[in-house]
């Protein structure tokens, strides 16, 4: 299969994920959450099983669309249920652990899936995912509360959440941070191998290191969110912007280049739990009918930031070399700083 076709499959998955998540989340917000989660997990299992069986590219595309259509809503629902059943004082760290779970899945899942595909076939990778899905399904069926408090509302009543200034600032911050991250992360492989001259054999280990840094970032995110996180966001984003600005110079040396990349992979994650809590707390207090939508906002607008950052990166390398990516990404860092100061003012009133 040509690389361009693989790229199309990835783009199609991301596009369907971004579009379907708010639609399905909003349309199903009045359903029983336990039954909805079981239904979505069933569809997820079917999508991955069809992927494992795919004999043609068209079949594969159809199967990935099925999976993408429900993946975002499943994540949103998990975050929602976690926020409901977790005591308020433990909520930041538990949400951070949920985020760390996704990072761990990426860090371990991607190289493991690649290894299985190399030793056996990519079909076998998806058969294993289907098997794991059945195990997770059984655990969720056992542990998930059958009934949780929920306030029902029409689609327009749910969308009223998007009028709130704190929510809009949180959305802007999410887009800005992910845009900065993917301005450099889109080309992280050539940054490591071409600019810093690491060998191809070192690449996977260094990518694993960056993944571990993301997991550490999730844990720090929980600590920051537990200690008045909104007030600390400007400091986090100032550090993030400084690291982005020095990246170009740091890439001239292997050690400093990897240290700055590793630090960036930690810092760009720290905002997440705090912003998730902003969305949830605003919904709980002012828009209880929008709670399901609130828990999906980060995953929705993260995709917007990823797309914007990737576009920025590809445009930059058409006119400049890879070492300029950090300087360009810092523009998004400045935007995040400004938005975080505005958000902090709302919480100081």
Regions found by a protein language model. Name each.
Residues 19-55:
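Conserved MFS/SLC helix-loop-helix module at the cytosolic interface between two early adjacent transmembrane helices
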Residues 21-32, 218-229, 317:
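Helix-to-loop junctions at the C-terminal end of transmembrane segments
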Residues 32, 53-59, 70, 197, ...:
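Helix-breaking motifs and short loop linkers at transmembrane-helix boundaries and internal kinks
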Residues 47-50, 58-67, 255-263:
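Paired small-residue
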Residues 57, 63-102:
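Cytoplasmic helix-loop-helix junction between adjacent transmembrane helices
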Residues 59, 87-144, 187-194:
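Helix-loop-helix hairpin linking two adjacent transmembrane segments in secondary transporters
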Residues 168-208:
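Extracytoplasmic gate region of multi-pass secondary transporters
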Residues 282-320:
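A late C-terminal transmembrane helix in Major Facilitator Superfamily
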């Amino acid at each position: 299969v040509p690389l361009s076709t693989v790229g199309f499959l990835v783009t199609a998955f991301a596009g369907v994920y971004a579009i379907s998540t708010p639609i399905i989340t909003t349309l199903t917000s009045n359903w029983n959450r336990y039954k909805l989660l079981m239904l979505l997990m069933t569809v997820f299992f079917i999508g991955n099983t069809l992927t494992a069986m795919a004999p043609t590219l068209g079949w594969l595309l159809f199967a990935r669309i099925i999976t993408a259509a429900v993946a975002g809503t499943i994540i949103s629902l998990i975050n929602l249920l976690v926020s409901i059943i977790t005591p308020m004082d433990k909520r930041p760290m538990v949400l951070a652990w949920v985020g760390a779970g996704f990072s761990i899945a990426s860090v371990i899942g991607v190289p493991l899936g690649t290894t299985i595909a190399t030793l056996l076939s990519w079909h076998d990778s998806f058969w294993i995912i289907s098997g794991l899905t059945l195990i997770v399904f059984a655990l969720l069926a056992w542990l998930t509360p059958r009934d949780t408090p929920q306030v029902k509302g029409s689609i327009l009543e749910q969308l009223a959440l998007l009028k709130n200034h704190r929510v809009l600032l949180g959305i802007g911050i999410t887009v800005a941070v992910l845009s900065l991250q993917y301005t450099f992360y889109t080309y992280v492989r050539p940054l490591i191998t071409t600019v810093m001259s690491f060998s191809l054999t070192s690449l996977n280990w260094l990518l694993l290191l960056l993944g571990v840094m993301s997991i550490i970032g999730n844990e720090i995110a929980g600590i920051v969110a537990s200690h008045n996180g909104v007030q600390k966001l400007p400091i986090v984003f100032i550090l993030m912007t400084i690291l982005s600005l020095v990246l170009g110079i740091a890439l001239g040396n292997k050690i400093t280049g990897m240290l700055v990349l590793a630090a960036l992979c930690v810092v760009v994650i720290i905002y997440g739990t705090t912003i998730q809590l902003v969305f949830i707390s605003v919904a709980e207090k002012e828009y209880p009918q929008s709670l399901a939508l609130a828990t999906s906002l980060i995953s929705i607008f993260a995709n917007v930031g990823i797309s914007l950052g990737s576009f920025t990166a590809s445009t930059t390398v058409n006119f400049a070399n890879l070492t300029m990516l950090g300087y360009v990404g810092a523009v998004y860092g400045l935007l995040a700083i400004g938005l975080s100061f505005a958000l902090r003012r709302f919480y100081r009133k």
